[in-house]
Amino acid sequence: LVGSEMCIRDSDETVDELLDEAVELAKNSDVAVIFAGLPESFESEGFDRKHMRMPDCQLKLIDEVAKVNENVVIVLHNGSAVEMPFADKVKGILEMYLGGQNIGTAEKALLFGEANPSGKLAETFPEKLSHNPSYLNFPGNMDDVDYAEGIFVGYRYYDEKGIKPLFPFGHGLSYTTFEYSN
């Protein structure tokens, strides 16, 4: 196992030397695992997100590593849905949300096949912000957000608008197969 740090924590600044180091490591690796997500400047208590983007430095890292290694796995840490323009360029995405103090142990078990990923998404991940049901009425004014979409939330909105989400509510893959019989 080898590693590299690409972005400065809680910054969107790309450090070219670190990017070059990460790409070089990825070229010579069987699998490239990239830990990514949202820093506190993008997502935290006390304010609403203005967009669903991840930091540009992380997107650049994912894009550059995917050019030199076909086996890229992204491990995401974020509090809610993010845009994933890289979804079709990587072999796997492991959504870990904000898992707490023992998250590293869980990630290791999942990445090394010691445990079976079996979670399902508790929300829909739209492809982009403008596909989100609340997009038309957000951000509202300082104190109020008008949720004018009525019953057209979740799958109803996507069905009504003919929009295919990136990952629908309940999406999740597992290594397990099930069979029912009498």
Please name every model-derived segment.
Residues 36-55:
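Glycine/threonine-rich flexible loop motifs
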Residues 67-72, 90-91:
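A short helix->loop->beta-strand "cap" motif at the edges of active sites that frequently abuts
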Residues 77-182:
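Secreted, periplasmic, or luminal enzymes acting at the cell surface/secretory milieu
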Residues 9-14, 50-53:
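Short, flexible loop segments at the rims of nucleotide/cofactor-binding pockets, characterized by
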Residues 1-8:
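Short, small-residue-biased leader/transition segments that mark boundaries at the very start
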Residues 29:
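An anion/phosphate-binding loop that grips the pyrophosphate of nucleotide cofactors and donors
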Residues 19, 26, 59-62, 104-108, ...:
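Extracytoplasmic/secreted envelope proteins and their assembly/folding machinery
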